[in-house]
């Protein structure tokens, strides 16, 4: 006779996908989480939605709220990592209560987590640099537009990009720009740079969030096609820009897999008592060009995908 599984609750703390620019990336992560939740329904798993709006710097505050109000009812935690003492403190507090944490998207190895599921960000940056090297013949200046320097996935992308050119001893000048989800400010800054500096020959947007304002600035500066642009992740706007020739390629980090595999790793540990094979589970990025885009277009989520899951 089969006995029903006791209800097990997992806290999922991540930026909401239905507010502003978060929809470009986090929507797929939430879809991955919902897909795994549906698959694991027979095991009586409930994933508690603690989505939040606002900057990632507010994440420790949301973890504090979960810890204070829900610590007695949850068996595990899935969240992102930020380099903030308050974040590390609350992850340690969860660990002391025997609540394992799985990180997705970004890592902080010194924190007490079970594992991290993330894109191979150094590889993503290196792939973008190699593409730009080929597109430009290593001539001119390359801008690498990243996100929040407190988030490992952002600065590791930029690092991988820089390291490629350093190892190849290229004369190409690399200029880093960090933008904390302020697309209009980024657009204005890039537009001024593109209009004033004819030596800019390439741009790599490390994040999905920054890809649309990068494309708009290149278009409005009248330099689409001449400035080679590599975008990040696949969504309706990036697809259109690739087909229009504003983007020459997309580095696709498969965010759906981050949400899905993060839940699976924690589920296997809690339900099956299986430890992850590694404390770092990497998703290998894919280079999308016009020629292979049709094979991945089915991955593009509808605008109402989060609400319909």
Q: Where are the model-predicted features located?
A:
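Alpha-helical recognition/docking segments in bacterial nutrient-uptake
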Residues: 5-123, 127
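Hinge/cleft segment of the Venus flytrap/periplasmic-binding protein
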Residues: 8, 149, 165, 254-309
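Short beta-strand->loop
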Residues: 15-16, 118, 143-152, 178-179
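Short, solvent-exposed amphipathic alpha-helices that sit
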Residues: 24-41, 61, 124-128, 152-172, ...
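Short beta-strand elements in bilobed, periplasmic/extracellular small-molecule ligand-binding domains
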Residues: 33, 37-59, 142-144, 162-184
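Hydrophobic alpha-helical
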Residues: 66-70, 75-99, 161, 175-239
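Anion (oxyanion) recognition and catalysis
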Residues: 95-96, 166, 243
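Hydrophobic alpha-helical segments within soluble ligand-binding/sensing domains
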Residues: 117-142, 156, 186-187, 234, ...
């Amino acid at each position: 006779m089969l006995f029903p599984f006791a209800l097990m609750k997992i806290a999922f703390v991540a930026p909401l996908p239905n507010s502003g620019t978060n929809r470009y990336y986090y929507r797929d992560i939430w879809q991955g989480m919902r897909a795994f939740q549906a698959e694991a329904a027979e095991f009586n798993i409930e994933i508690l939605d603690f989505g939040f709006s606002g900057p990632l710097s507010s994440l420790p505050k949301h973890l504090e709220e979960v810890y204070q109000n829900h610590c007695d009812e949850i068996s595990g935690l899935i969240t992102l990592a930020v380099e903030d003492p308050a974040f590390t403190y609350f992850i340690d507090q969860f660990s002391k209560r025997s609540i394992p944490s799985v990180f997705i998207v970004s890592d902080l190895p010194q924190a007490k987590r079970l594992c991290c599921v993330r894109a191979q960000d150094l590889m993503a940056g290196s792939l973008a640099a190699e593409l730009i090297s080929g597109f430009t013949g290593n001539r001119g200046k390359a801008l690498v537009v990243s996100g929040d320097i407190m988030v490992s996935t952002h600065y590791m992308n930029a690092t991988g990009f820089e390291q490629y050119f350093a190892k190849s001893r290229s004369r190409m000048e690399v200029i880093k720009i960090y933008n904390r989800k302020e697309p209009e400010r980024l657009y204005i800054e890039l537009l001024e740079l593109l209009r004033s500096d004819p030596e800019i020959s390439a741009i790599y947007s490390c994040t999905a969030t920054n890809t649309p304002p990068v494309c708009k600035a290149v278009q409005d500066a009248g330099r689409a096609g001449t400035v080679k642009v590599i975008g990040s992740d696949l969504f309706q706007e990036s697809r259109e820009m690739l087909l229009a020739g504003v983007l020459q390629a997309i580095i696709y980090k498969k965010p759906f897999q981050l949400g899905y595999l993060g839940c699976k790793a924690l589920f296997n540990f809690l339900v099956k008592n299986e430890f992850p094979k590694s404390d770092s589970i990497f998703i290998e990025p894919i280079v999308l060009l016009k020629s292979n885009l049709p094979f991945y277009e089915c991955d593009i989520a509808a605008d109402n995908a989060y609400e319909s899951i």
